[in-house]
Each structure stands twice: as C-alpha cells, then as structure tokens.
C-alpha cells in the first residue's frame, strides 16, 4: 500500500511508552510524521481524522491489565477511514493481560484496521525497581526492528486483505478498568509551589492553585 503520512500517538506519563513508539516510528523517517501526545489533557479533547492511506501507531501502558481510562476517552475523538493501525502496549514486567485486545476493539469500532501489534517491557511507573531502566538499548533496538518489519509488511499489504489480527487477551475482559489508585502522591517540605506537577498531570487531579490539594 502507498502511505502518505505516519501518525504516532502515545499515553506516556513516565515517558517510557513514548520512547518505544518513537523508535518504532523511526523506521518511517522518509514519510511525513506527526506525533499526538495523549498524555496532555487538552490534546485528548481534540478530534482527529485519519485517511485510508495514512498509518496510525498508538502506544499505551497497561494499567491493571487494561487500557488507561483517559486513552479510552480520547479514542472517542479518533475517526479512521479503513486506516491501518499498529497497536503497542507497554507494561512493568508483569503482564499486559487484556490491554491489546481492548485497544484493538476500541480502534476497530472507530474505523481502523489493525495490521500489527507488539508489547514491550518498560520501567514500572510507581515501583521503579520493577524493570528499572527499561526500555534499555536492546529494547529500543527491538522496537526499531519491529518498525522495519512493519514497513515491509505495509509495502506489500492491501488493507482490505489484512484479515483479523490476533492479539493476546480475552473478551469479556478479565479485570475491571482500574479506578482510583490505592494511594495518593503528596508534596513534602521541599515543595516550592512551582506548580509544574499541576501543569503536567495527565488527568488534572492536582489543584492549579495549591499542589497539596489532590
């Protein structure tokens, strides 16, 4: 198929998912490329429309074995037109459970055709001793190699012949969506009220006037 543009979207509060997806996308450096940072609250409120001759690569972390709720909400603003999509899940060295199958179901419902999928180990967002330092150099090399294989597959592919891409997971889903985390992040005596945390919080959970209010 003849691609005209590549989009890569990611939800990456710890920046690790972004690293993986950007390395996959680097295989398509000869194409126009645009990133969509779904970690940003305002970006998730925008509408996006994709054509049949464009490719979307979307990466999300597994939250309790499911797609993060903010991403599910954001995908309601995505509309494809038989647009090929690549699904990427990252996880903190435990399991992705139903993350990929949930992501697949959400994008199919919005007019996308899954043509590839992968999962990568990344450092756990809250327990950094789990897969600390991942993705490492070898992980990112594998991400680039995955991108190279995708590029070759898409060169030979016609989307209506793509078939039903099999991904791990079960439906109905094994676990309910993750609700509130069982802990809260709190400031300490070193807080200087710079408000950076409130500015970058993906779900606007921190007061914009007082960071101690969460």
Task: Describe these PLM feature segments.
Residues 2-40, 46-180:
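FMN-binding flavodoxin-like domain, especially the glycine-rich phosphate-binding loop
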Residues 16, 184-204, 213-214:
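Cysteine-centered iron-sulfur cluster-binding motifs in ferredoxin-type domains/subunits
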Residues 208-209:
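Short beta-strand "wing" residues that participate in macromolecule-binding interfaces
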């Amino acid at each position: 198929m003849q691609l005209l543009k590549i989009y890569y979207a990611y939800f990456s509060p710890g920046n690790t998912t972004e690293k993986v997806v950007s390395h996959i996308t680097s295989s398509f450096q000869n194409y126009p490329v645009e990133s969509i940072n779904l970690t940003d609250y305002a970006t998730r409120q925008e509408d996006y429309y994709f054509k049949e001759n464009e490719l979307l690569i979307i990466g999300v972390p597994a939250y309790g074995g499911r797609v993060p709720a903010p991403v599910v909400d954001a995908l309601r603003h995505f509309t494809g037109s038989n647009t090929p999509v690549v699904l990427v899940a990252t996880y903190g060295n435990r399991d992705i459970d139903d993350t990929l199958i949930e992501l697949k179901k959400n994008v199919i419902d919005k007019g996308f055709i899954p043509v590839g999928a992968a999962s990568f180990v990344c450092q756990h967002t809250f327990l950094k001793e789990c897969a600390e330092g991942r993705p490492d150099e070898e992980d990112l090399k594998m991400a680039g190699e995955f991108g190279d294989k995708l590029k070759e597959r898409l060169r030979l592919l016609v989307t209506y012949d793509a078939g039903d891409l099999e991904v791990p997971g079960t439906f109905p889903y094994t676990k309910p969506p993750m609700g509130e985390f069982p802990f809260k992040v709190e400031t300490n005596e070193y807080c200087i009220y710079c408000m950076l945390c409130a500015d970058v919080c993906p779900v606007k959970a921190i007061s914009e006037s007082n960071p101690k209010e969460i």
